[in-house]
Curated annotation (Swiss-Prot):
It comes from Mycobacterium tuberculosis (strain ATCC 25177 / H37Ra). This is UPF0235 protein MRA_1997. GO terms for cellular component: cytoplasm. SUPFAM superfamilies: YggU-like (SSF69786). Belongs to the UPF0235 family.
Length: 76
């Protein structure tokens, strides 16, 4: 079974690492890593996997690699 989730990312945040639910029900993920060389994407993938209690290998970034809005595919 696969699902997808769209998240809003706040890279370089002093508030992170943190996952919040925004006012419209969207996930907002704060990470300390900068948006350079995929560091923030890796941190978001790890944090999302931990938050959803899934292995990192089951969380794949499918779109939004250079955007603050990212879509992940979740395999259960």
């Amino acid at each position: 079974m696969t699902d997808s989730v769209v998240v809003r990312v706040k890279p370089g945040s002093h508030k992170g690492p943190l996952v919040e639910v925004g006012p419209n029900g969207e996930l907002i993920i704060y990470v300390r890593e900068p948006a350079i060389d995929g560091k923030a994407n890796d941190a978001v993938t790890r944090l999302l996997a931990a938050h959803l209690q899934l292995p990192k290998s089951r969380v794949k970034l499918v779109s939004g690699a250079t955007s603050r809005f990212k879509r992940f595919r979740l395999s259960r």
